[in-house]
């Protein structure tokens, strides 16, 4: 099954299959049919909401949706964390609503990062029902209080944070149409935003690119890893669907590492300098992870990629060990195995089985990158403006 997932992923990011292996070419017709059926189902579902045959729920506090058009590597979860922390720093308690699917690695990572703070995380497929449970339990900041909050924020004065929920963040919300939102943020993987341009499963697209028209803000992620020409091409594509959309830029900045045997340990990035490193990951954009390790100054970098959200098993650990031994033979030194936080949070215990090697977890954080007239201040202003607009308050 893992091999099939990897093959489908390779097909999704390949535009021409003339030189592809026979297995890839044999699957393309079936994937094309499946994509057509998926597209029809998507149109029907969208129409049901458009004509109010399916109900949209309006929540009593501002809602920010963070989503994407394609699977994996778009920076969606780091952006959710960034917005959560910004809201807390501003004095509002956010509630993150997430499905928590595919092993729940993203939820576990958010819980670990945000533990001890006021941020609340609601997990469930029915996000309207999950929101109702949290709003009943904690209450919400009423409109008059939010007006006071925006007034104080405009004057750069402090607002005292409370347990009451002041904003809701929809994690992976772009295709979750049952909840109305006040700001729609679409995240795009700058390394390969559209893949082969087809809908799933033939391609990586969860919706046609026309869905960019619904977005209020576009964020190009991994902007530090792409060329200026690639960035211009992405901007032109986005603005071809919505000329007026503000475009921001983000990147993942490595901060430190920790040992899988001690999550409280703190290992400096310099530990990888001049070292042999085996990058092991089961994430949506392994290329970005590997490039970030290369930029630490590692002497030799090898990689072992699994499909997104893959749950490591004993045979995978054996594969990692064999690959590490091969790297040790090539480089004449014992390699360090590095994984991502999502891989660690998916199953922290199984990685401890690699006891013959040092296994480190790379910790990174999302940063808004200043390009042209956009920077972190203008992005934060956009967030506040959207929240204030719900109550017709000028921010």
Curated annotation (Swiss-Prot):
For whether the record's keyword set contains Lipid metabolism, the answer is yes
Give its E.C. classification number.
2.7.1.130
Q: What is its main location?
A: mitochondrion
Show the NCBIfam families listed in the entry: lpxK
Entry protein name: Probable tetraacyldisaccharide 4'-kinase, mitochondrial
Task: Quote any Pfam family the record assigns.
Answer: LpxK
Transit peptide range?
A: 1-32
Question: In a knockout, what does one observe?
Answer: No visible phenotype under normal growth conditions, but plants lacking LPXK accumulate high levels of disaccharide-1-phosphate (DS-1-P).
The keyword Signal appears for this protein: no
Which function does this protein serve? Answer: Involved in the biosynthesis of lipid A, a phosphorylated glycolipid that in bacteria anchors the lipopolysaccharide to the outer membrane of the cell. Transfers the gamma-phosphate of ATP to the 4'-position of a tetraacyldisaccharide 1-phosphate intermediate (termed DS-1-P) to form tetraacyldisaccharide 1,4'-bis-phosphate (lipid IVA). Lipid A-like molecules in plants may serve as structural components of the outer membranes of mitochondria and/or chloroplasts, or may be involved in signal transduction or plant defense responses (Potential).
């Amino acid at each position: 099954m893992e091999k099939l997932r990897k093959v489908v992923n390779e097909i999704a990011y390949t535009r021409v299959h003339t030189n592809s292996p026979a297995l890839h070419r044999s699957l393309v017709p079936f994937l094309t049919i499946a994509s057509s059926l998926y597209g029809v189902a998507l149109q029907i579902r969208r129409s049901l909401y458009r004509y109010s045959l399916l109900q949209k729920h309006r929540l009593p506090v501002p809602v920010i949706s963070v989503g994407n058009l394609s699977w994996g590597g778009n920076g969606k979860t780091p952006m959710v964390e960034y917005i959560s922390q910004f809201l807390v720093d501003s004095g509002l308690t956010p509630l993150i609503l997430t499905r928590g699917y595919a092993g729940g690695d993203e939820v576990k990572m958010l819980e670990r990062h945000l533990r001890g703070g006021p941020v609340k995380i609601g997990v469930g497929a029915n996000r309207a029902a999950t929101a109702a449970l949290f709003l009943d339990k904690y209450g919400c900041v009423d409109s008059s209080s939010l007006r006071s909050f925006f007034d104080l924020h405009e004057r750069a004065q402090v607002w005292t944070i409370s347990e009451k929920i002041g904003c809701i963040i929809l994690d992976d919300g772009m295709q979750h149409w049952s909840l109305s939102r006040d700001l729609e943020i679409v995240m795009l993987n700058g390394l390969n935003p559209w893949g082969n341009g087809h809908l799933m499963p033939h391609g990586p697209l969860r919706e046609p690119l026309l869905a960019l028209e619904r977005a209020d803000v576009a964020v190009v992620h991994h902007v530090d890893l792409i060329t200026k020409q690639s960035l211009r091409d992405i901007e032109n594509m986005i603005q071809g669907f919505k000329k007026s959309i503000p475009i921001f830029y983000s990147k993942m900045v490595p901060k430190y590492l920790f040992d899988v045997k001690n999550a409280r340990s703190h290992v400096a990035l310099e530990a990888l300098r001049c070292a042999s490193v085996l990058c092991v990951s089961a994430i949506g954009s392994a290329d970005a992870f590997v490039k970030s390790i290369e930029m630490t100054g590692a002497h030799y970098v090898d990689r072992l990629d699994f499909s997104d959200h893959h749950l490591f098993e004993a045979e995978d650990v054996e594969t990692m060990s064999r690959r590490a031994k091969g790297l040790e033979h090539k480089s004449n030194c014992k390699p360090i195995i590095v994984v991502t936080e999502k891989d660690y949070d998916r199953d922290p215990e199984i990685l401890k089985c690699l006891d013959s090697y040092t296994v480190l977890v790379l910790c990174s954080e999302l940063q808004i990158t200043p390009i042209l007239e956009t920077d972190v201040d203008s992005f934060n202003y956009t967030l506040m403006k959207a929240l204030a607009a719900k109550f017709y308050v000028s921010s």
